[in-house]
Swiss-Prot record:
Gene assigned in the entry: spoIIAA
Domain (STAS) ranges: 3-113
Keyword Phosphoprotein recorded: yes
Family listed: Belongs to the anti-sigma-factor antagonist family.
Transmembrane segments: none
UniProt cross-references to InterPro entries, sorted A to Z: Anti-sigma_ant (IPR003658), Anti-sigma_F_ant (IPR014237), STAS_dom (IPR002645), STAS_dom_sf (IPR036513)
Protein name in UniProt: Anti-sigma F factor antagonist
GO biological process per UniProt: sporulation resulting in formation of a cellular spore
Length: 116
């Protein structure tokens, strides 16, 4: 299975919607796409919608953590939303929810960032 990446810019927020599998085969493509979008659009915040993400491994966690650090340097925030139970468990085990906020829906996350 592959990874479909949908990126949408809303003011200074980049919405990232992932569908499929985020693993060592697809992580570099996501990293490059998101980094380019952040740099080209003056992005300060990320909303990561994982509702359609069926699988993620440590490579995926690494990409997400790297983008979190990139956004933090801009005094921004990353919000994960609409996460599947299996991927949520991986986030919990890795401790990422200690630094990255989880919201129920993309709409709610955008509202909290003032762009909905």
């Amino acid at each position: 299975m592959s990874l479909a990446i949908d990126l949408e810019v809303k003011k200074d927020v980049l919405c990232i919607r992932l569908q499929g599998e985020l693993d060592h085969h697809t992580a570099e493509s996501l990293r490059a796409s998101v980094t380019k979008a952040i740099e080209e659009n003056g992005i300060r915040h990320l909303v990561l919608n994982l509702e359609q993400l069926s699988f993620m491994d440590s490579s995926g966690l690494g990409v997400i953590l790297g983008r979190y650090k990139q956004i933090k340097q801009k005094n921004g925030e990353m919000i994960v939303c609409a996460i599947s139970p299996a991927v949520k468990r991986l986030f919990e085990l890795s401790g990422l929810f200690k630094i990255i906020r989880l919201d129920e829906s993309e709409q709610y996350a955008l509202h909290r960032l003032g762009v909905a």
